[in-house]
Amino acid sequence: MRIILLGAPGAGKGTQAQFIMEQYGIPQISTGDMLRAAVKAGTPLGLEAKKVMDAGQLVSDDLIIGLVKERIAQEDCVKGFLLDGFPRTIPQADAMAANGISIDHVIEIDVPDEEIVKRMSGRRVHPGSGRVYHVVFNPPKVEGKDDVTGEDLAIRPDDEESTVRKRLAIYHEQTKPLVEYYGKVAAAGQTQYNKFDGTQSVAAVSEQLASVLK
């Protein structure tokens, strides 16, 4: 079972990825993890990627595709894999297809932008312990204070509303077109495409996913 998970940052992909991995015994493949592992192992592709990154440049799609092919040929991918954060663009999706990397299921978790902003910009963290709160969904007993120590809570830079909106804008510009792309691939009978409402409870989304991934 070869799966691509699409959705904006904060849509809940990580939670559902965990469910899919546990339920179906397939690994989650993240391009970041893959790059780090290849560089550490000193593989030919890893050495090439290190050279590019050391020069402060972006790793090319061809190099990433090479790493993906290398990774999915490993033993733990025999039953399939879950691609996380890749492809991000249509050229990357085209390159995957050109390299014979077929996908069985494309899953989109759809959450409106304003809901994502509410979810992410409402997070508060206690820097000392890493305890996480949410002003709406899991508020501290005293506003702005950690329940245990009474110390001030902070907003992580990634959760600042302006940062969240920037990340959403990049998603809509680069990755959202993949929804239409894979819709066409599915219409041609080459994959299955399913969209889920990510504003539902985690359990409801997992249940619907399981019914599609039988």
From Swiss-Prot:
Region spans: LID: 122-159
Chain positions recorded as AMP binding sites: T31, R36, Q57, L58, V59, G85, F86, P87, R88, Q92, R156, R167
Binding site for ATP: G10, A11, G12, K13, G14, T15, R123, V132, Y133, Q200
Cytoplasm recorded as keyword: yes
A GO molecular-function descriptor: adenylate kinase activity
Localization per Swiss-Prot or TrEMBL: Cytoplasm
Family annotation (InterPro entries): Adenyl_kin_sub, Adenylat/UMP-CMP_kin, Adenylat_kinase_CS, Adenylate_kinase_lid-dom, P-loop_NTPase
UniProt keyword annotation of Nucleotide-binding present: yes
One CC-aspect GO term: cytoplasm
CDD domains from the UniProt entry: ADK
Catalytically driven reaction(s): AMP + ATP = 2 ADP
GO BP field: AMP salvage
Record note on quaternary structure: Monomer.
Domain commentary: Consists of three domains, a large central CORE domain and two small peripheral domains, NMPbind and LID, which undergo movements during catalysis. The LID domain closes over the site of phosphoryl transfer upon ATP binding. Assembling and dissambling the active center during each catalytic cycle provides an effective means to prevent ATP hydrolysis.
NCBIfam families: adk, PRK00279.1-1, PRK00279.1-2, PRK00279.1-3, PRK14527.1
Protein family per UniProt: Belongs to the adenylate kinase family.
PANTHER family xrefs: NUCLEOTIDE KINASE
HAMAP family: Adenylate_kinase_Adk (MF_00235)
Biological role: Catalyzes the reversible transfer of the terminal phosphate group between ATP and AMP. Plays an important role in cellular energy homeostasis and in adenine nucleotide metabolism.
Name of this chain's protein: Adenylate kinase
Organism: Shewanella baltica (strain OS155 / ATCC BAA-1091)
Gene this chain is encoded by: adk
